[in-house]
UniProtKB/Swiss-Prot annotation:
It catalyses: L-histidinol phosphate + 2-oxoglutarate = 3-(imidazol-4-yl)-2-oxopropyl phosphate + L-glutamate. Pathway: Amino-acid biosynthesis; L-histidine biosynthesis; L-histidine from 5-phospho-alpha-D-ribose 1-diphosphate: step 7/9. It comes from Thermococcus gammatolerans (strain DSM 15229 / JCM 11827 / EJ3). CDD domains: AAT_like (cd00609). It is an enzyme of class 2 (transferase). PROSITE patterns: AA_TRANSFER_CLASS_2 (PS00599). Its EC number is 2.6.1.9. This is Histidinol-phosphate aminotransferase. Its cofactor is pyridoxal 5'-phosphate. Belongs to the class-II pyridoxal-phosphate-dependent aminotransferase family. Histidinol-phosphate aminotransferase subfamily. Keywords: Amino-acid biosynthesis, Aminotransferase, Histidine biosynthesis, Pyridoxal phosphate, Transferase. InterPro entries: Aminotrans_II_pyridoxalP_BS, Aminotransferase_I/II_large, HisP_aminotrans, PyrdxlP-dep_Trfase, PyrdxlP-dep_Trfase_major, PyrdxlP-dep_Trfase_small. It holds the Pfam family Aminotran_1_2. One of its GO terms (biological process) is L-histidine biosynthetic process.
């Protein structure tokens, strides 16, 4: 009864259990400030819960458009960025998608789920994008997925390499989920390149992973096409209200981002050569320590394939980071971890 395609998938799993420190999901360690939550709750008291939300999430789209200085017709909102990814795989004509491993696994997941072949163009040894090689494989592609900063390596991709791919005029989804942590974005290129889709989220910098709010910036033609196939009412009133209020307090988000970046750089200095440079809210660490950390009550992300023997570590609160660093010193030996 169940399709063979579905049987070929494994459920997405995370480590469950009562662990004292969780640094595995790239979450923001800081919750929304209480006053921001109260503002959301106050607005929700005036909303009718018995009515469906706006069919195309226009209140949230207008708030995001005002924030960027674009038209709401350039904005689409999803129940998390994953929802938008699932549609973007189906939106365009072409024979395959292109991904650049090691990268975010959901690109290939949604492609395979929709029966779309996946073509891989590995990142260079330093994890940078090979724009020329990607452009070659982009011919007849439905869409090219590029994450910048990349997950799980953490590095920002060179603008000139991304532009090489955009010049093919094939659809390019630039996933900027972590852009706030580096302060650089290519969203303004949507005017010059109608084939560009910039994907963003409220889960990371804004600390709203539990709300499930993602959005994209693109040309009107792409946004219009997406809403032709997007499930109606998928973005609820809670999500839309939280988006509007959070954007009014973007200055608080920026303060939180600065704290996380400071901690990230402190951790990187302490880890020395074990840690790769990062432009995101996590670090890629060259250390086969997943099980040993788990024994100490610390959950990180175990990596495989090309990154076998590496872990990805979310930047947490200072005490969490200190506990992680102390554990690494015990596991790797003091000489491998500088400054501890």
């Amino acid at each position: 009864m169940i399709s063979e395609l579905v049987k070929s998938f494994q459920p997405y799993r995370v480590v469950e259990g009562n662990y004292r420190i969780r640094l595995d999901k790239n979450e923001n360690p800081y919750d929304l400030p209480g006053e921001v939550k109260e503002e959301i709750f106050e607005e929700l008291r005036e909303v009718s819960f018995n009515r469906y939300p706006h069919i195309t999430s226009m209140p949230a789209r207008e708030a995001i458009a005002d924030f960027y200085g674009v038209s709401p017709d350039n904005v689409a909102v999803g129940n998390g960025s994953d929802e938008l990814l699932s549609y973007l795989v189906r939106l365009f004509e072409g024979n395959h998608i292109v991904i650049t491993p090691p990268t975010f696994g959901m690109y290939s997941f949604y492609a395979k789920l929709n029966g779309v072949p996946v073509v891989e163009v590995p990142l260079r040894e330093d994890f940078t994008l090979d724009g020329e090689a990607v452009a070659e494989k982009a011919k007849n592609a439905r869409v090219v997925f590029i994450a910048s900063p990349n997950n799980p390596t953490g590095n920002l991709q060179p603008e000139e390499e991304i532009i090489r791919v955009l010049e093919t005029r094939r659809p390019v989804v630039l996933d900027e989920a972590y852009a706030e942590f580096v302060g650089k974005s290519l969203w303004r290129l949507i005017e010059e390149y109608p084939n560009l889709v910039v994907l963003r989220t409220f889960s990371k910098a804004f600390g709203m992973a539990g709300i499930r709010a993602g959005y994209m910036l693109a040309g009107e033609e792409i946004v219009d096409a997406l809403y032709r196939i997007k499930s109606p009412f998928s973005v609820g009133i809670m999500t839309m209200t939280a988006i509007r209020v959070a954007l009014r307090h973007a200055d608080l988000m920026e303060k939180t981002v600065r704290k996380i970046v400071e901690e990230r750089e402190r951790m990187r200095r302490k880890l020395g050569e074990l840690a790769y440079p990062s432009d995101a809210n996590f670090l890629l660490v060259r250390l086969n320590a997943y099980e040993e950390l788990l024994k100490r009550g610390i959950v990180v992300r175990k990596l495989s394939g090309r990154l076998e023997g590496h872990i990805r570590v979310t930047v947490g609160r200072r005490w969490e980071n200190d506990a992680f660093l102390e554990a690494v010193e015990e596991i790797a030996g003091g000489e491998s971890v500088g400054g501890l």
